[in-house]
Amino acid sequence: MFKEKYEGEQKLVDKVVNQSWVYLKRAHFHSQTMGVISIAFSILVSWLGLPGMLQFTVSTLSGFGSLGYGFFWLLSGFMAPGLGSTGAAKHSVELVAQVSAVSFFVAVVVTFVLVIHKMFIQRGSRKETA
């Protein structure tokens, strides 16, 4: 594999391995940051007193997004040396990144819409009826 993927050049191997290490660190950072945000969203939608199904949906989407996006970087980092490049590794598992990023983005948008609705629209309608 060394001769086939890297044409026998140690420089190319070192470059891919070093970039793979960056991807593994990136997996940790994304999982940690997005995981904390996911927990915050779960607490926030619970605190807003929303219906249980809506709370479950936001929590599930944000949790899946944070787990999946970190997993994408982790897979890319581990697969890159065997595939010969980090680009090939990212391309081979890009669907994981796309699905998880979309689910996290949907959770973010839904959470902000619910917060704005609860703070401004619902509060404004209470003042009008009082």
Q: Predicted segment positions?
A:
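Individual transmembrane alpha-helix segments
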Residues: L12-I37
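Alpha-helical transmembrane segments of multi-pass integral membrane proteins
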Residues: L67-T129
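Hydrophobic alpha-helical segments of membrane proteins, primarily the transmembrane helices
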Residues: K25, T60-G63, Q98-A101
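Juxtamembrane loop-transmembrane helix junctions in multi-pass integral membrane proteins
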Residues: K15-V22, G49-T57, S85-L95
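Hydrophobic alpha-helical transmembrane segments
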Residues: H30-I43, F105-V109
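Histidine-/acidic- and/or cysteine-rich, low-complexity loops and terminal segments associated
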Residues: M1-K15
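Membrane-helix exit/interface motif
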Residues: I37-G49, F72-L83
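Cytoplasmic juxtamembrane regions at transmembrane-helix boundaries
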Residues: S42-S62, R123-A130
